[in-house]
Amino acid sequence: MPHSLNVNYSFLSKFKKHVSSSVVLIACTILALIFANIPVVKEWYFSLWQHPMAVSVGGFNLFSHGGHSMNVMMVINDFLMAIFFLSVGLEIKREILVGELSSMKKALLPIIGACGGMLVPVLVFALFCPANAAMQRGLAIPMATDIAFSLGVLSVFKTRVPVSLKVFLAALAVADDLGGIIVIALFYSSDLSWLYLGLSALCVAVMIIANISKVRAKSFYLVVGLVLWYMMLNSGIHATISGVIVALCIPATLKKGTGHYLERIRMQISKFPVIDVDDLHKTVVLTHNEIHMLKSIESAADKMISPLQDLEDSLHGVINFFVIPLFAFANAGVDLSQMSIGGLFSGVGLAVMLGLVVGKFLGVFTFSWIAIKTKIVTLPAGISWNAFASVCVVCGIGFTVSMFIADLSYSALGEAGITLLNEAKLGVLCGSVISAVLGCVLLSRTLPKEDC
């Protein structure tokens, strides 16, 4: 029973967190498009991201790569997104340990759906994208499902959405993120430096040994993680992967059992003097001993939360209300004057859009349908096939990770890459909007009606 409560809390709390942040994300996306297309601020908007940044100590600059300072856009896409992937990694680790990916029975349907949702969009992209080596670099763009936007769509329907449907979508998005991380690590690394790779491995070894030695201080892992980020930045492996590695090394267990800390709290509370009813609304000056007891209770309560969950909770606000909105504001700005409508309906833009709208739905639904019909898994309780299909449409909302992979795919190709990147971004935006609107229409028709 406690485990069941844990899982429900995990997904329902995640649902509430992401739906509020999706509004901020939409606002920043719209602002980016406005700023990128209004002549008065357009030049300022695009030049803003090219300003060099430095965090220097003596002659050492943390934000440097290959001897050159990083600009604002690089810091957002390489450093802040590493923090985003740290959060994603913590989420994946928690779900594997105690959540919806903790057993094969629970994890199988979202994993099978995610596999289809990654494979088929790639095939659709390859089918509609011209056989050009530069264009084909974006094969992985339509693979991702944006958890904030997709859960935001479900939030529109409030209590009409069965919990099992929310759980499926959230678990699929987590599995999707894991697939995206693997793709980034394998296919977006280049010019490997064995020296920096060796130093990166040393950082990982230090964190693993610290975990085994029961080092529970989050600050230790974050400091070593910062060093790891710099080493990976210069190693040739994409630096954002460092966030996932740090997440996997952060302890998910307590130093002592929960019972030990609960008993300590109960003991201190029992010793605390009873406050007279008449004094409840008065300012009470505590003795040193009472302050010590309260601090002891606070310390024990803090130690009942594992470093993994504590850090995940602490990062929530930073990720959802700073990192992702800033990423959207920096990356969603597409100069529409440089593009034609025909550009969207050909080449990269069309391939990305169809990969998200058609590929995602076909992949998630078809793979899930086959698995259910062959009795490998079962359809989640309380869900009709029509409602399930509607949620598969919502899976085509691919924003954050899709935009990120688009940048990795085309940003290094010079002038030609800028055009392809803009087409890809527009494809992501259009595909995501179509999937969201279509998903809303279908869900409104297929979900159970609210009781009057």
What are the residue ranges of the model-derived segments?
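C-terminal ends of transmembrane helices
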Residues: 6-13, 86-102, 151-162, 205-216, ...
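Entry/N-cap segments of selected transmembrane alpha helices
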Residues: 95-123, 193-202, 338-359, 385-392, ...
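Transmembrane alpha-helices that form the ion-translocation and gating core
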Residues: 111-151, 159, 353-410, 430-448
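Predominantly late transmembrane helices and immediately cytosolic-facing juxtamembrane segments
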Residues: 2-17, 218-224, 242-381, 447-452
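Structural signature of hydrophobic alpha-helical transmembrane segments
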Residues: 74-85, 133-148, 189-202, 240, ...
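Alpha-helical transmembrane segments of multi-pass membrane proteins
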Residues: 29-44, 331
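Functional cores that coordinate and move charged inorganic groups
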Residues: 154-266
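Hydrophobic transmembrane alpha-helices of secondary-active transporters
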Residues: 59-65, 69, 73-98, 318-339, ...
